[in-house]
Amino acid sequence: MTPELERAVKKYTQWFASHRKSGELIKVQVWLTVNHGCIEFLTADDSFKVKRIRRNPRAICYIGAKDGPAVPGTAEVVMGRDAILRVYRAYWKTHPFVMAIIALAIKGRIKNHRQVLIRVSPDQPNPLADMTDPAV
């Protein structure tokens, strides 16, 4: 992993880019966690991110900033409660002040099965191989 990428990961934020039907690349800022080399984040199950991923799983994660290090990969929607709760707990470690405000809304969506996890498996060679951050 390059020093630039390592610094960017510690910001725990990314610009997630996925493709519209037209092929246009859409970037959206989201938080991130890294789990065994895969980039993960939470979103609502009816978000446009989810709809675009289901149509075309190819994605690019710009780590740390809109023009940060690009990590291309394949995204998938994960609905497993344990994985979602792991990322929820990681968010408390990385963004505690914001989570104090939005935690109830996220927890409610998890309880009502309206929250999903997006997992991006980076292309090989994986620059985040075997990395987990933050550890929960």
What are the functions of these language-model segments?
Residues 1-15:
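Extreme N-terminal tail/first-helix region
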Residues 3, 16-23, 102-108:
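Short helix-to-loop capping/linker segments positioned immediately adjacent to catalytic or ligand/cofactor-binding
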Residues 4-6, 24, 40, 76, ...:
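Glutamate identity and glutamate-enriched acidic tracts
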Residues 4-5, 39-43, 47-51:
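Covalent nucleotidyltransferase core used to form phosphodiester bonds in nucleic acids
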Residues 11-45, 59-62, 70-72:
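Short beta-strand segments
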Residues 46-126, 131:
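Short, structured beta-strand-loop surface elements
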Residues 134-135:
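Ribonuclease/tRNase effector modules and their secretory precursors
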